[in-house]
Every structure is written in C-alpha cells, then in structure tokens.
A protein has these predicted regions:
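Glycine-rich cofactor/substrate-binding loops
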Residues: 59-96, 157-158, 340-518
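Short, Lys/Arg-enriched N-terminal segments with co-localized hydrophobic residues
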Residues: 40-59
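Short, charge-rich patches within N-terminal targeting peptides
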Residues: 12-20
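Amphipathic alpha-helices that form helix-helix packing interfaces
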Residues: 97, 118, 122-125, 187, ...
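Methionine residue identity
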Residues: 1-2
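Acidic, glycine-rich loop-and-beta core segments that form the ion-binding/anion-interacting portion
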Residues: 280-364, 368
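A helix-coil-helix interface module used to build multimeric assemblies
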Residues: 58-248, 252-253, 258, 262, ...
C-alpha cells in the first residue's frame, strides 16, 4: 500500500521497539491508496472532485452538498466528523448496503447488473479491509460516506445508485442496531463464561463456612459458595436484561424509513427486515429514524452489570486484604508498589470499581441527549455511538479480565472459619433454639442479646459458656444447645429454599447452569 506523503506527519516518538513506523496523515487529508491485490487503483478520483483544504490535505466532497455553494469550513468538517467512532460499523454498513441493493434490484428500482456490480464492489472493500490492503480514511465524514465513495470509485455509476430510497438517517439507525446486536451477543457469551467460573468456584467452596455480613458487620454464618452464588444470580439477571434488550432491538428494522417520511420508491421493507434478521420493519418511519431506546436499554443493562461487577470487586478487595484474608489472588492478576516491596494490590478489581462510574456516565449521556430533541433526527443523536460503544468496550474489557482472575482465585477456608468463630454470628440460632423450645421469639431475642453482652464483657464466645451458665439465663437450655450453635450445623440447618446448605448451593449451581443452557 502506498500513501501520498503530502498527507503524512512524522513518526511517533514512542515507537521504541516497533518495526513499523506509523506516519499519520494531517487532519483533513485523504489517503492515496493503491492495492496490492486485484484492483490496480482502489480510488479512481476521476469519479468525483477532490477538495484541498487549508490544513495541507485533500477532502472528499460531502454526500449532502446539494444546495450549498460554499465549501464548508475545515473546522466544521472536523467538528462534524464521526468517522473516528463510527468506523467500527463498517461491516454492518456494508451488509446493510448489500441487502438494500438486493431489494432495489428485486423491486426493479435498479438493474440486476447494478446489483451485481454493487455487491462485487462492496465485497472487494470488505476483503481489502480484512487483508489490510485498504484502510479507512480517517478524514471521511463518516463510515457511510467512506463506503459509498470508495464503492463509487470502484464500480462507477452503480455505486451512485446504491443510496436510492435510503437516507443516512435510516442507514445509521440500521447500522448501530446490527452492531449492537453482535456486541450484545458477545457480551452475553462473556457473562455466561463468568457465571460458569463462579459456579466452579462455588462448587469447590460449598462447605467453607464464613461470616455473612450486614452493614459490614458479622451477621450470620453462610458458606463461601453461597456468597459467590449470589453474584451468579445477579449476573443471570444481567444476562436476561441483555437478551430482552436485544430481542426488542431485533423486533423492528428501520431501513426504508428514509430521512423521516418514507420514500416514493416501491421498497419491500419486509424483505430487507427478514434478510437482516429483524422480525418486521418498524411501523412508523419517524420513530424508525429517531428511536435510540435500544441504545439506552442496552446501556442500562450494561450499567447494571457493571454495578454487580463493582460489588463483587469490592468484596474481593476486602477479602484479599490482611484484615480479612479470605482469599489469595494469583500474582498474575495483581500489581505491586514502586516503593513498598510487600504490596500486592488488587488493581483489576479497583479499576472495575472505578470504570463502573464511566458506564453510568455513558448511560446518563444517552438519557440527557435524547430527553429534549424534537422529532425526527437531530445531529445530537450522533453522540449516541461514543457513549454506547464506550459502555460496550468497558464492560467487555472488565468481563475479559475478571473471569480468569476469579478462576485462579484461591479461597482460604481456615481464615474464613476463624473469622466466623468470632462475632457471635450464631446468636440468631441461639434465639431460634429457645423459640423452638417454646419461648416467644421476642423474649428469646432479648435473652440471647443479654447473653451476648455478658460474653463480650467476659471475652467469651457462646460456645465457651458451660451448660450451667446457659441455664442462668433460661431453664430451656439443654446439652443440645452446643449442636444448635455449631457453625456448620447453623449453615446446614437453614434448609429453606435458596439457603446456604451445601445441598442448596449445589442445587443453585445446577439451576443456574440450566438457565444458561449449559
């Protein structure tokens, strides 16, 4: 590939060991690219005019310059451009264009020869992008402009007919749906992988007794497996939310809505909807181009998932601290300190906790962007992609990192048990013991509270009281009190559905796996 060096800057200073020198073009420039493959000249510039701007580079003409008689200020071009963030939709843009052109041919709106030329040209663009022969021009206004003008340079007038019966308004509404559909399916797969990793750890630790907490105070005995499975259920709901959002996204196809009022061409919108994997075309053309509910809904699901990852991360941060020491993280997923040699920092989980606010910001951006704009399409809506794509990328990165970290995490059951032995987490079981012997629960609660207070003053646990000392508080106490307040018995005695017994944890694992079709 050859690049016109009039459009190039200097090599990056940070490319120390890199064998390849990158020379980025100046802003506003277009690559002059020649193929190494079947096409001698990818861009035939005789097919359209090329404008030279005052930054030292060339600009393609905008697709929308119909009534304009004056060149747009280069600063407006830079401000208006979306190529840096919508370029990721190029495969979806090409796919949508192939289906749209096929429909135009089917309806007799363009000739079959034009359809064949368009498809051949679009496929060649896709092939050259994949092989690296072609790069996306960073100075094109947007991905739609780049594709159409590259196509026209390759196939001539047939490329100019591609946009018949279509607006960029319905085109971008389609592209982002197709892109987010793929992104959602990928994220769903990652969430499933994380859930299975949690299930594996929970199965191994289904009998490890630890304190359960409320208000970050030791409360009642649970097992580590039970605690982990709480997050599996949260993530299962996240999976469901993404599936629901994707199903609604796939319900309606916006292609054919035009700018807002449909078109006079005899389009077959049901054909394009079916070919693109949608249930039906959208029922209202204005809604078709102005709807971004699907971005908001998917980002909301991602924000909720990030909230759950953040809660899990916070627990991991606590658990691996010396104050808890319930787990040990693998060295590969921790960092050190530049000054304190003893440090082993859980940076992964801290970053996840921090990045959660970033995704919340993405959701807020979408909501605020959409709340006040009139129908139909407004340029404000260009801001949707940066927000939703950032949320996708952030969640994808967090899931990709936390899953292997959890897979290599090592529980420390002895430390969990030592923590459980302190804090009177069996006090509720003591009160339940008296209640089952006939004492009203509120009286049993008060009696046990008095005992706990006395034990704290005497620096004892409930298990360390003699039977005579128990009887000083109630004659209902018998020798079986010691079994009743044994921590393992406390866990195994909580046989209510969804509880912490080992059998319950194993059933939860089986239920969760069945729900994700494993």
């Amino acid at each position: 590939m050859m690049v016109d060096r009039r459009a190039c800057g200097t090599a990056q200073k940070n490319q120390g060991r890199s064998k390849h020198q990158t020379e980025p073009p100046l802003k506003g420039c277009i690559y002059f690219i020649c193929a190494r493959g079947a096409h001698t000249n990818i861009f035939d510039y005789s097919l359209f005019s090329i404008h030279y701007n005052n930054t030292g580079g060339f600009l393609m003409p905008q697709l929308w310059q119909g009534r304009s008689s004056k060149a747009v200020d280069s600063r407006v071009n830079d401000f208006n451009s979306s190529i840096r963030f919508d370029a990721r939709m190029i495969e979806q843009d090409i796919h949508g264009s192939m289906v749209h052109s096929a429909m135009l041919g089917k309806q007799g709106i363009i000739s079959q020869q034009d359809v064949d030329d368009i498809h051949k040209g679009l496929q060649s663009i896709l092939n050259d992008l994949h092989s690296g022969v072609l790069e996306i021009d960073p100075n094109a206004e947007d991905v739609h402009t780049f594709v159409e003008q590259t196509l026209t340079a390759r196939v001539g007038d047939a490329g100019k007919r591609l946009h018949t019966g279509r607006s960029r308004n319905d085109q971008v509404a389609l592209d982002i749906r197709l892109n987010l559909r793929e992104a959602s399916l990928h994220l769903q797969g990652q969430i499933k992988e994380l859930i299975l990793t949690i299930c594996d750890q929970a199965e191994k630790s289904s009998s490890y007794v630890m304190p359960g907490y409320t208000h970050l105070q030791r409360a009642q005995p649970v097992t580590f497996g039970h605690q982990l499975m709480a997050y599996a259920w949260m993530l299962l709901r996240d999976l469901g939310r993404m599936q629901d959002a994707t199903a609604r996204m796939d319900a309606e196809c916006p292609l054919g809505s035009g700018a807002l009022a449909g078109t006079t061409y005899p389009l077959d919108r049901f054909y394009t909807a079916q070919e693109l994997g949608f249930a039906a075309p959208c029922g209202n053309s204005i809604d078709g181009v102005s709807d971004r509910d699907f971005c908001i809904e998917l980002t909301s699901a991602m924000a909720t998932c990030m909230m759950h990852l953040s809660r899990l991360s916070e627990e991991i941060i606590l658990w691996c601290s010396w104050e808890f020491k319930f787990i040990e993280l693998d060295d590969a997923f921790t960092t050190g300190s530049s000054i304190m040699p003893q440090k082993k920092n859980p940076d992964v989980t801290e970053l996840i906790r921090g990045k959660t606010g970033r995704v919340y910001g993405d959701l807020n951006t979408l909501l605020v962007m959409m709340k006040g704009i009139p129908l139909a399409y407004d340029k404000d809506m260009q801001e949707d992609k940066e927000a939703v794509f950032d949320a996708v990328d952030t969640l994808e990165l967090c899931l990709k990192t936390i899953t292997p970290m959890l897979a290599t995490m090592m529980p420390l059951p002895a430390n969990m048990r030592r923590a459980a032995d302190k804090g009177f987490i069996n006090a509720t079981d003591c009160a339940d013991y008296l209640t089952k012997k006939g004492m009203p629960f509120r009286d049993a609660y008060k009696c046990t509270g008095t005992m706990v207070g006395a034990c704290i003053r005497a620096d004892k646990t409930l298990e360390e009281l003699t039977l005579d000392e128990f009887k000083q508080y109630s004659d209902l106490f018998e020798a079986d009190i010691y079994d009743a307040i044994d921590l393992t018995h406390c866990c195994e005695g909580r046989t209510s559905y969804g509880g912490p017994t080992q059998a319950s944890v194993l059933k939860q694992i089986a239920d969760v796996k069945s729900k994700i079709n494993c």
